[in-house]
Amino acid sequence: MTEEILELYQFEACPFCSKVRQKFTELGVDFIARSVDPNDRTRVENVSGQTGVPVLVDPNTDRVMPESDDIVEYLEENYG
């Protein structure tokens, strides 16, 4: 079975988002960066029920996860 690509809802300048992007790179895991407009967070709210970033969407496990530390731990446990 082919794995689907993970999605990361994020801001480029967000240090918490940067931490998650670095973990993706460290693990060699492909992902799609979905940049969120800081003035219109409707898209991330529709996905996660909240307006904060980063938010990980893993279509392989149907997980939607906020919080950078939780995302990093999840990536290490499931894709490391």
Task: Give residue spans per PLM region.
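GST-like domain detector, emphasizing the conserved glutathione-binding G-site
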Residues: T2-E12, S18-G80
